[in-house]
Amino acid sequence: MHIPQLNKYNLSFPHPNEANEDGIVAWGGDLNPSRLVRAYQSGIFPWYAKDDPIIWWSPNPRLIMELDDFKLRRSLKKNLKKFTYKFDTKFQEIMQKCATTPRNHQDGTWINDDIIEAYTVLHGQGIAHSIESYIDGVLVGGLYGLSIGKVFCGESMFADVNDASKAAYAVLIKHLKLWGYEFVDCQVPTNHLKSLGAKEV
């Protein structure tokens, strides 16, 4: 199947229904903030290895977290008080931590310098956000993502201490409910997020 190349001077994307069986919609283009917002509004996101061209994805099925489906297990609920939490105070550091955290079955990271630079611009525009977990003032976990309408698009998380990222996620879910959000777009299915209550749609 032919995968279309994006025009650098045109922000439009193919329809997500035109993605190939792997979920790839297009390749090329750039990480212009306006293009990124247009992509996420269409259910499309960039995900590519360091030396590859930009690849744009819209997986089907994809993983979402309905806010009422989040499973706050007793052990995690007990550990929530171990941490203090902040929003949007160390966005770039959160991204860098997510980029350098070793992950099972993953060689390297897709969170490269260009991604960090582009999403930091979105953070400055009030579109990308971080939630951070601290112990005694030290950053020990957190996550980041994008706020698109009433959907939070979760990107990545890290934990230097057990449950630090899960706790940040639990606090995020609580606030998203208060703010009237509908769900978290988790994008690619993972067993970890499924264990917290996410489902494929």
Model-identified regions with their sequence ranges:
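N-acyltransferase acceptor-side catalytic subdomain
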Residues: 1-201
